[in-house]
């Protein structure tokens, strides 16, 4: 066998590596999420392969939802940059996100709200 190339890879074309995020069509890193899931589990690192893909898809969807609502809030206020205030308005303005995200957002301010009993009717005026 002098001079010839022999081995497992002889004659095969090498394919480019495709990440699990690309296979799943996601932007969030499936491999990194899988690593974090394995490091935080109690069953000695046993996490299914699809668990990381599913978790990454959920995180990506929730992030896109919050960013879309925050972008709408910033457009309503005629600014081009999303601030913590816009995130706060977006999350507290949506009933489902409000029940899901209970965290306090630093720099988010408060949500304006006036109770209905405090609002006077149009025909009434206060007498002194």
UniProtKB/Swiss-Prot annotation:
Region described as Disordered: spans on this chain: 1-25
Q: Which UniProt keywords apply?
A: Acetylation, Chromosome, DNA-binding, Isopeptide bond, Methylation, Nucleosome core, Nucleus, Ubl conjugation
Query: Which GO-annotated molecular functions does the record name?
Result: DNA binding; protein heterodimerization activity; structural constituent of chromatin
Give the sites modified to N6-lactoyllysine.
12, 14, 116
What is one GO cellular-component annotation here?
Answer: nucleosome
Its chief place of residence is nucleus
PROSITE patterns in UniProt:
HISTONE_H2A (PS00046)
The record's region (M6 cassette) falls at 89-100
Q: Which InterPro entries match?
A: Histone-fold, Histone_H2A, Histone_H2A/H2B/H3, Histone_H2A_C, Histone_H2A_CS
Where on the tree of life does the source sit, at the highest rank?
Eukaryota
N6-acetyllysine found at: 5, 8, 12
One biological process term from GO is: heterochromatin formation
**Where does it localize?**
Nucleus; Chromosome
Biased region (Basic and acidic residues) positions are 1-12
Q: How does it assemble?
A: The nucleosome is a histone octamer containing two molecules each of H2A, H2B, H3 and H4 assembled in one H3-H4 heterotetramer and two H2A-H2B heterodimers. The octamer wraps approximately 147 bp of DNA. H2A or its variant H2AZ1 forms a heterodimer with H2B.
**Which PANTHER family does the protein's record reference?**
HISTONE H2A
Family stated for the protein in its record: Belongs to the histone H2A family.
Which named protein is this?
Histone H2A.Z
Instruction: Give the species.
Output: Gallus gallus
